Protein backbone atom coordinates (compact mmCIF):
# COMPACT_ATOMS: atom_id res chain seq x y z
CA UNK A 1 0.00 0.00 0.00
CA UNK A 2 1.54 3.33 -1.07
CA UNK A 3 2.22 6.19 1.33
CA UNK A 4 0.17 8.49 -0.93
CA UNK A 5 -2.87 6.23 -0.60
CA UNK A 6 -2.47 6.07 3.18
CA UNK A 7 -2.20 9.86 3.40
CA UNK A 8 -5.35 10.21 1.27
CA UNK A 9 -7.29 7.86 3.53
CA UNK A 10 -6.08 9.80 6.59
CA UNK A 11 -7.17 13.15 5.11
CA UNK A 12 -10.65 11.76 4.34
CA UNK A 13 -10.90 10.33 7.84
CA UNK A 14 -9.89 13.66 9.41
CA UNK A 15 -12.37 15.64 7.30
CA UNK A 16 -15.14 13.14 8.07
CA UNK A 17 -14.36 13.39 11.77
CA UNK A 18 -14.36 17.21 11.65
CA UNK A 19 -17.71 17.24 9.84
CA UNK A 20 -19.12 14.78 12.36
CA UNK A 21 -17.85 16.94 15.25
CA UNK A 22 -19.41 20.03 13.68
CA UNK A 23 -22.76 18.29 13.37
CA UNK A 24 -22.58 17.08 16.98
CA UNK A 25 -21.66 20.61 18.16
CA UNK A 26 -24.57 22.19 16.32
CA UNK A 27 -26.98 19.49 17.40
CA UNK A 28 -26.06 20.15 21.05
CA UNK A 29 -26.27 23.92 20.54
CA UNK A 30 -29.70 23.57 19.00
CA UNK A 31 -30.98 21.29 21.77
CA UNK A 32 -29.99 23.93 24.34
CA UNK A 33 -31.80 26.64 22.37
CA UNK A 34 -35.46 27.56 22.97
CA UNK A 35 -35.90 26.92 19.23
CA UNK A 36 -35.82 23.17 19.96
CA UNK A 37 -38.88 23.49 22.19
CA UNK A 38 -41.17 25.00 19.54
CA UNK A 39 -42.21 24.38 15.96
CA UNK A 40 -39.12 25.47 14.04
CA UNK A 41 -37.15 24.67 10.92
CA UNK A 42 -33.78 25.97 9.85
CA UNK A 43 -30.83 25.67 7.50
CA UNK A 44 -27.37 27.22 7.85
CA UNK A 45 -25.06 26.94 4.86
CA UNK A 46 -21.58 28.26 4.08
CA UNK A 47 -22.03 30.82 1.32
CA UNK A 48 -18.81 30.14 -0.58
CA UNK A 49 -18.72 26.33 -0.40
CA UNK A 50 -22.43 25.50 -0.23
CA UNK A 51 -21.72 23.13 2.67
CA UNK A 52 -24.65 22.64 5.06
CA UNK A 53 -23.44 23.49 8.57
CA UNK A 54 -26.69 22.50 10.28
CA UNK A 55 -30.30 21.80 9.37
CA UNK A 56 -33.43 20.91 11.29
CA UNK A 57 -36.78 20.22 9.63
CA UNK A 58 -35.51 22.11 6.58
CA UNK A 59 -37.93 20.25 4.32
CA UNK A 60 -41.02 21.00 6.44
CA UNK A 61 -43.48 23.77 5.60
CA UNK A 62 -43.96 26.89 7.71
CA UNK A 63 -45.84 30.17 7.37
CA UNK A 64 -43.23 32.57 5.95
CA UNK A 65 -44.98 35.87 6.83
CA UNK A 66 -42.98 38.65 5.15
CA UNK A 67 -40.18 36.27 4.16
CA UNK A 68 -42.46 35.66 1.15
CA UNK A 69 -41.25 39.05 -0.10
CA UNK A 70 -37.93 37.38 -0.93
CA UNK A 71 -39.74 35.21 -3.49
CA UNK A 72 -41.45 38.31 -4.91
CA UNK A 73 -38.08 40.10 -4.99
CA UNK A 74 -36.44 37.27 -6.94
CA UNK A 75 -39.29 36.97 -9.44
CA UNK A 76 -39.49 40.74 -9.98
CA UNK A 77 -35.78 40.98 -10.72
CA UNK A 78 -35.94 37.93 -12.99
CA UNK A 79 -38.95 39.12 -15.02
CA UNK A 80 -38.85 42.94 -14.91
CA UNK A 81 -35.25 43.98 -15.45
CA UNK A 82 -34.14 47.34 -14.01
CA UNK A 83 -36.96 49.83 -14.71
CA UNK A 84 -40.57 50.23 -13.53
CA UNK A 85 -43.24 49.70 -16.23
CA UNK A 86 -45.35 52.63 -15.06
CA UNK A 87 -48.39 52.71 -17.36
CA UNK A 88 -49.42 51.85 -20.92
CA UNK A 89 -51.10 54.05 -23.52
CA UNK A 90 -52.44 54.04 -27.05
CA UNK A 91 -53.75 56.96 -29.11
CA UNK A 92 -56.50 56.43 -31.68
CA UNK A 93 -57.91 59.43 -33.58
CA UNK A 94 -59.40 61.75 -30.94
CA UNK A 95 -59.00 59.33 -27.99
CA UNK A 96 -56.15 58.49 -25.63
CA UNK A 97 -56.54 55.06 -24.03
CA UNK A 98 -54.42 54.24 -20.99
CA UNK A 99 -53.96 51.22 -18.74
CA UNK A 100 -52.54 50.75 -15.27
CA UNK A 101 -49.67 48.32 -14.82
CA UNK A 102 -49.78 48.18 -11.04
CA UNK A 103 -47.06 50.82 -10.58
CA UNK A 104 -47.37 51.73 -6.86
CA UNK A 105 -45.52 55.06 -7.20
CA UNK A 106 -48.08 57.19 -9.10
CA UNK A 107 -48.89 60.25 -6.92
CA UNK A 108 -47.50 58.31 -3.96
CA UNK A 109 -46.09 60.90 -1.48
CA UNK A 110 -43.12 58.60 -0.81
CA UNK A 111 -42.07 58.67 -4.49
CA UNK A 112 -43.49 61.90 -5.98
CA UNK A 113 -44.07 60.25 -9.36
CA UNK A 114 -46.44 62.37 -11.50
CA UNK A 115 -45.52 60.84 -14.85
CA UNK A 116 -49.06 59.68 -15.67
CA UNK A 117 -50.63 62.99 -14.65
CA UNK A 118 -48.04 64.93 -16.66
CA UNK A 119 -48.65 62.72 -19.67
CA UNK A 120 -52.45 62.98 -19.51
CA UNK A 121 -52.48 66.71 -18.79
CA UNK A 122 -50.67 67.43 -22.07
CA UNK A 123 -53.26 65.61 -24.15
CA UNK A 124 -56.23 67.36 -25.76
CA UNK A 125 -57.90 64.06 -26.60
CA UNK A 126 -60.68 62.21 -24.81
CA UNK A 127 -59.09 60.37 -21.88
CA UNK A 128 -60.22 56.77 -21.45
CA UNK A 129 -59.07 54.73 -18.48
CA UNK A 130 -59.14 51.06 -19.49
CA UNK A 131 -59.87 49.01 -16.38
CA UNK A 132 -59.38 45.21 -16.44
CA UNK A 133 -62.27 43.21 -17.85
CA UNK A 134 -62.17 41.07 -14.72
CA UNK A 135 -61.83 42.77 -11.34
CA UNK A 136 -58.55 42.20 -9.51
CA UNK A 137 -59.22 41.11 -5.89
CA UNK A 138 -58.41 44.16 -3.72
CA UNK A 139 -57.39 42.00 -0.76
CA UNK A 140 -55.30 38.85 -0.73
CA UNK A 141 -56.63 35.40 0.05
CA UNK A 142 -56.01 34.59 3.71
CA UNK A 143 -55.52 38.20 4.84
CA UNK A 144 -56.85 39.14 8.26
CA UNK A 145 -60.15 40.97 7.63
CA UNK A 146 -59.86 43.31 10.63
CA UNK A 147 -56.59 44.85 9.38
CA UNK A 148 -58.55 46.86 6.79
CA UNK A 149 -57.99 50.16 8.66
CA UNK A 150 -54.21 49.74 8.97
CA UNK A 151 -51.80 51.27 6.47
CA UNK A 152 -50.00 47.96 5.91
CA UNK A 153 -53.22 46.56 4.38
CA UNK A 154 -53.59 49.01 1.50
CA UNK A 155 -55.73 47.50 -1.24
CA UNK A 156 -54.45 46.05 -4.53
CA UNK A 157 -55.52 47.78 -7.75
CA UNK A 158 -54.41 47.93 -11.39
CA UNK A 159 -53.72 51.67 -11.25
CA UNK A 160 -52.89 52.57 -7.65
CA UNK A 161 -52.85 56.27 -6.77
CA UNK A 162 -51.47 57.88 -3.60
CA UNK A 163 -50.34 54.44 -2.45
CA UNK A 164 -54.07 53.58 -2.11
CA UNK A 165 -53.96 55.45 1.19
CA UNK A 166 -55.60 58.61 2.55
CA UNK A 167 -53.29 60.74 4.67
CA UNK A 168 -54.97 62.51 7.61
CA UNK A 169 -53.30 65.37 9.48
CA UNK A 170 -54.16 68.54 11.42
CA UNK A 171 -52.95 71.97 10.31
CA UNK A 172 -53.97 75.13 12.18
CA UNK A 173 -56.55 73.04 14.03
CA UNK A 174 -58.16 72.01 10.72
CA UNK A 175 -58.33 68.50 9.33
CA UNK A 176 -56.45 67.94 6.07
CA UNK A 177 -56.51 64.96 3.73
CA UNK A 178 -54.18 63.83 0.97
CA UNK A 179 -55.68 63.49 -1.54
CA UNK A 180 -58.03 66.41 -0.93
CA UNK A 181 -60.80 64.47 -2.68
CA UNK A 182 -61.54 62.56 0.54
CA UNK A 183 -62.23 65.70 2.60
CA UNK A 184 -65.91 65.27 1.76
CA UNK A 185 -65.82 61.66 3.00
CA UNK A 186 -65.37 62.75 6.63
CA UNK A 187 -68.69 62.00 8.32
CA UNK A 188 -68.15 62.72 11.99
CA UNK A 189 -66.08 62.21 15.13
CA UNK A 190 -65.68 59.47 17.72
CA UNK A 191 -64.01 58.95 21.09
CA UNK A 192 -61.01 56.97 19.81
CA UNK A 193 -57.64 58.63 19.17
CA UNK A 194 -57.36 57.47 15.56
CA UNK A 195 -59.16 57.79 12.22
CA UNK A 196 -61.58 54.94 11.52
CA UNK A 197 -62.94 53.99 8.09
CA UNK A 198 -66.15 52.09 7.49
CA UNK A 199 -65.18 48.52 6.62
CA UNK A 200 -67.00 48.47 3.27
CA UNK A 201 -67.00 52.06 2.02
CA UNK A 202 -65.03 55.29 2.03
CA UNK A 203 -66.60 56.98 5.03
CA UNK A 204 -64.26 58.17 7.77
CA UNK A 205 -64.81 59.23 11.38
CA UNK A 206 -62.16 61.28 13.16
CA UNK A 207 -60.94 61.52 16.75
CA UNK A 208 -62.59 64.25 18.79
CA UNK A 209 -59.21 65.61 19.96
CA UNK A 210 -57.00 67.31 17.38
CA UNK A 211 -54.29 68.66 19.66
CA UNK A 212 -52.35 65.39 20.00
CA UNK A 213 -53.10 63.98 16.54
CA UNK A 214 -50.15 63.81 14.17
CA UNK A 215 -50.48 61.83 10.93
CA UNK A 216 -52.34 58.65 10.00
CA UNK A 217 -52.48 56.75 6.71
CA UNK A 218 -55.72 54.82 6.15
CA UNK A 219 -56.44 52.51 3.19
CA UNK A 220 -59.30 53.58 0.95
CA UNK A 221 -61.69 51.24 -0.86
CA UNK A 222 -60.49 51.08 -4.46
CA UNK A 223 -62.56 50.81 -7.65
CA UNK A 224 -62.25 51.71 -11.33
CA UNK A 225 -64.79 54.47 -10.77
CA UNK A 226 -62.78 55.98 -7.90
CA UNK A 227 -59.55 55.79 -9.93
CA UNK A 228 -61.19 57.82 -12.71
CA UNK A 229 -62.59 60.34 -10.20
CA UNK A 230 -59.20 60.83 -8.50
CA UNK A 231 -57.52 61.38 -11.87
CA UNK A 232 -60.27 63.77 -12.99
CA UNK A 233 -60.04 65.68 -9.71
CA UNK A 234 -56.30 66.15 -10.20
CA UNK A 235 -56.41 66.84 -13.95
CA UNK A 236 -59.52 69.04 -13.78
CA UNK A 237 -60.95 67.29 -16.81
CA UNK A 238 -63.15 64.28 -17.46
CA UNK A 239 -61.82 60.72 -17.47
CA UNK A 240 -64.01 58.06 -19.09
CA UNK A 241 -63.97 54.40 -18.01
CA UNK A 242 -64.01 51.38 -20.29
CA UNK A 243 -63.27 47.76 -19.48
CA UNK A 244 -60.71 46.66 -22.05
CA UNK A 245 -57.75 44.29 -21.90
CA UNK A 246 -54.45 45.93 -22.73
CA UNK A 247 -54.16 46.39 -26.48
CA UNK A 248 -51.12 44.57 -27.95
CA UNK A 249 -50.23 47.86 -29.67
CA UNK A 250 -50.22 49.81 -26.39
CA UNK A 251 -46.85 51.22 -25.44
CA UNK A 252 -45.57 50.75 -21.90
CA UNK A 253 -43.92 53.83 -20.39
CA UNK A 254 -41.00 53.17 -18.03
CA UNK A 255 -40.33 55.53 -15.12
CA UNK A 256 -37.72 55.07 -12.39
CA UNK A 257 -35.60 52.15 -11.22
CA UNK A 258 -36.95 49.04 -9.52
CA UNK A 259 -34.33 49.41 -6.78
CA UNK A 260 -36.47 52.32 -5.53
CA UNK A 261 -39.23 49.75 -4.87
CA UNK A 262 -37.02 46.96 -3.55
CA UNK A 263 -35.53 49.05 -0.73
CA UNK A 264 -38.83 50.05 0.98
CA UNK A 265 -40.29 46.59 0.33
CA UNK A 266 -37.35 44.89 2.04
CA UNK A 267 -36.31 47.52 4.60
CA UNK A 268 -39.78 48.61 5.72
CA UNK A 269 -41.61 45.43 4.69
CA UNK A 270 -43.96 47.47 2.49
CA UNK A 271 -46.84 45.12 1.63
CA UNK A 272 -48.43 47.40 -0.95
CA UNK A 273 -45.24 47.50 -3.03
CA UNK A 274 -44.81 43.73 -2.79
CA UNK A 275 -48.33 43.04 -4.04
CA UNK A 276 -48.02 45.48 -6.92
CA UNK A 277 -44.69 44.05 -8.05
CA UNK A 278 -46.66 40.95 -9.00
CA UNK A 279 -49.05 43.11 -11.04
CA UNK A 280 -46.05 44.75 -12.75
CA UNK A 281 -44.80 41.29 -13.75
CA UNK A 282 -48.25 40.47 -15.11
CA UNK A 283 -48.55 43.74 -17.05
CA UNK A 284 -45.13 43.42 -18.68
CA UNK A 285 -45.95 39.89 -19.82
CA UNK A 286 -49.60 40.73 -20.64
CA UNK A 287 -50.86 38.20 -18.10
CA UNK A 288 -54.33 39.00 -16.80
CA UNK A 289 -55.65 38.56 -13.27
CA UNK A 290 -54.43 39.14 -9.76
CA UNK A 291 -51.78 37.55 -7.55
CA UNK A 292 -53.17 34.01 -7.77
CA UNK A 293 -53.18 33.98 -11.59
CA UNK A 294 -49.76 35.63 -11.88
CA UNK A 295 -48.16 33.26 -9.37
CA UNK A 296 -49.67 30.32 -11.29
CA UNK A 297 -48.00 31.68 -14.45
CA UNK A 298 -44.70 32.15 -12.62
CA UNK A 299 -44.81 28.54 -11.49
CA UNK A 300 -45.06 27.47 -15.14
CA UNK A 301 -42.61 29.98 -16.60
CA UNK A 302 -39.91 29.95 -13.94
CA UNK A 303 -37.12 27.40 -13.64
CA UNK A 304 -36.90 27.78 -9.86
CA UNK A 305 -37.67 24.47 -8.15
CA UNK A 306 -38.94 26.02 -4.93
CA UNK A 307 -42.02 27.37 -6.76
CA UNK A 308 -43.24 23.89 -7.56
CA UNK A 309 -43.49 22.77 -3.96
CA UNK A 310 -44.27 26.01 -2.12
CA UNK A 311 -47.82 27.14 -1.45
CA UNK A 312 -47.34 30.73 -2.57
CA UNK A 313 -50.49 32.84 -2.33
CA UNK A 314 -49.56 36.55 -2.33
CA UNK A 315 -46.67 38.92 -2.90
CA UNK A 316 -46.37 40.34 0.60
CA UNK A 317 -46.72 37.35 2.92
CA UNK A 318 -49.78 38.81 4.66
CA UNK A 319 -51.69 35.63 3.86
CA UNK A 320 -51.77 32.89 6.48
CA UNK A 321 -52.17 30.43 3.59
CA UNK A 322 -48.57 30.79 2.38
CA UNK A 323 -46.34 27.80 3.13
CA UNK A 324 -42.60 27.68 2.40
CA UNK A 325 -39.71 25.53 3.62
CA UNK A 326 -36.41 26.82 5.04
CA UNK A 327 -34.66 25.05 2.14
CA UNK A 328 -36.75 27.15 -0.29
CA UNK A 329 -35.33 30.36 1.13
CA UNK A 330 -31.78 29.02 0.86
CA UNK A 331 -32.46 28.48 -2.84
CA UNK A 332 -33.98 31.96 -3.20
CA UNK A 333 -31.13 33.67 -1.35
CA UNK A 334 -28.50 31.76 -3.32
CA UNK A 335 -30.16 32.83 -6.58
CA UNK A 336 -30.31 36.45 -5.39
CA UNK A 337 -26.63 36.30 -4.45
CA UNK A 338 -25.79 34.99 -7.89
CA UNK A 339 -27.79 37.76 -9.59
CA UNK A 340 -26.88 40.74 -7.41
CA UNK A 341 -23.64 39.90 -5.62
CA UNK A 342 -23.04 40.41 -1.91
CA UNK A 343 -22.27 44.14 -2.06
CA UNK A 344 -25.63 44.98 -3.67
CA UNK A 345 -27.54 42.67 -1.31
CA UNK A 346 -25.94 44.40 1.66
CA UNK A 347 -27.53 47.61 0.38
CA UNK A 348 -30.93 46.13 -0.47
CA UNK A 349 -31.48 43.98 2.64
CA UNK A 350 -31.98 45.36 6.16
CA UNK A 351 -28.84 45.29 8.34
CA UNK A 352 -28.72 44.72 12.10
CA UNK A 353 -28.15 47.92 14.04
CA UNK A 354 -28.33 50.09 10.92
CA UNK A 355 -31.30 49.82 8.57
CA UNK A 356 -34.91 48.77 8.19
CA UNK A 357 -36.66 46.23 10.37
CA UNK A 358 -33.33 45.02 11.80
CA UNK A 359 -32.13 48.48 12.88
CA UNK A 360 -33.15 47.98 16.52
CA UNK A 361 -31.39 44.61 16.86
CA UNK A 362 -28.19 44.76 18.91
CA UNK A 363 -25.84 41.83 18.39
CA UNK A 364 -23.65 40.55 21.22
CA UNK A 365 -20.49 40.91 19.15
CA UNK A 366 -19.66 44.10 17.26
CA UNK A 367 -17.93 41.92 14.65
CA UNK A 368 -21.16 40.11 13.73
CA UNK A 369 -23.45 41.39 10.96
CA UNK A 370 -26.80 40.13 9.68
CA UNK A 371 -28.39 41.18 6.38
CA UNK A 372 -31.80 39.56 6.21
CA UNK A 373 -35.55 39.77 5.71
CA UNK A 374 -37.68 39.22 8.77
CA UNK A 375 -41.31 38.20 8.90
CA UNK A 376 -43.75 37.99 11.77
CA UNK A 377 -47.33 37.29 12.79
CA UNK A 378 -48.63 36.57 16.25
CA UNK A 379 -46.78 33.39 17.34
CA UNK A 380 -44.56 33.47 14.22
CA UNK A 381 -41.08 34.86 13.57
CA UNK A 382 -38.95 34.05 10.53
CA UNK A 383 -35.55 35.37 9.48
CA UNK A 384 -33.77 34.54 6.23
CA UNK A 385 -30.59 36.10 4.91
CA UNK A 386 -26.84 36.28 5.44
CA UNK A 387 -24.73 36.18 8.62
CA UNK A 388 -21.10 37.34 8.81
CA UNK A 389 -19.07 36.14 11.79
CA UNK A 390 -16.06 37.78 13.47
CA UNK A 391 -13.68 36.07 11.02
CA UNK A 392 -15.49 37.62 8.05
CA UNK A 393 -17.00 34.30 6.98
CA UNK A 394 -20.50 34.59 5.50
CA UNK A 395 -23.30 32.06 5.91
CA UNK A 396 -26.67 31.94 4.18
CA UNK A 397 -29.47 30.91 6.53
CA UNK A 398 -33.19 30.56 7.02
CA UNK A 399 -34.78 30.12 10.45
CA UNK A 400 -38.56 29.75 10.64
CA UNK A 401 -40.54 29.55 13.88
CA UNK A 402 -44.31 29.02 14.03
CA UNK A 403 -46.84 28.37 16.81
CA UNK A 404 -44.72 29.80 19.64
CA UNK A 405 -46.79 30.48 22.74
CA UNK A 406 -44.89 33.64 23.62
CA UNK A 407 -44.21 37.10 22.20
CA UNK A 408 -42.69 37.69 18.77
CA UNK A 409 -39.88 39.68 20.41
CA UNK A 410 -38.93 36.61 22.44
CA UNK A 411 -38.82 34.43 19.31
CA UNK A 412 -36.72 37.08 17.58
CA UNK A 413 -34.19 37.03 20.41
CA UNK A 414 -34.05 33.22 20.31
CA UNK A 415 -33.28 33.28 16.56
CA UNK A 416 -30.59 35.96 16.88
CA UNK A 417 -28.94 34.25 19.86
CA UNK A 418 -28.76 30.97 17.96
CA UNK A 419 -27.19 32.62 14.91
CA UNK A 420 -24.49 34.26 17.00
CA UNK A 421 -23.02 30.82 17.72
CA UNK A 422 -21.57 30.92 14.18
CA UNK A 423 -18.04 31.88 15.23
PLM region descriptions:
Residues 1-29:
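Bacterial Sec-dependent N-terminal signal peptides
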Residues 21-61, 80-83, 119-124:
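Beta-lactamase-like hydrolase cores
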Residues 49, 83, 94-95, 234, ...:
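Coil residues (strongly favoring Ser/Thr
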Residues 50, 64-81, 159, 230-231, ...:
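Active-site SXXK
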Residues 53-55, 278-423:
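Small-residue-rich helix-loop
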Residues 79-94, 342-346:
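Short, well-structured active-site flanking segments
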Residues 92-169, 178, 185, 191-194, ...:
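Mid-domain, small-residue-enriched loop/turn segments at the edges of structured enzyme/sensor domains
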Residues 188-348:
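A small/polar active-site loop signature that marks catalytic segments
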Amino acid sequence: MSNQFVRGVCVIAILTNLFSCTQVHWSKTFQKSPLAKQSSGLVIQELNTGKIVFSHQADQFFMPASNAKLATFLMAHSFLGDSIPSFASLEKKDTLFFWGTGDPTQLNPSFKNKSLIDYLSKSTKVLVYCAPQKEIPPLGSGWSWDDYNDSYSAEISPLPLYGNLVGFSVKNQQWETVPHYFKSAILGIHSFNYVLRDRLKNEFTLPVSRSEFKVQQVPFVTSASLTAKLLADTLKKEVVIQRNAMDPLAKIQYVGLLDSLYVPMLHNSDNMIAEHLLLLIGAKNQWTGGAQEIIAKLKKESNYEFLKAARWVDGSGLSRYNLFRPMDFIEILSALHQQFGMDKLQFLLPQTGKTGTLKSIKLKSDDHVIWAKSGSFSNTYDLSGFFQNSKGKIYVFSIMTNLANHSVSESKRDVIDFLENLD
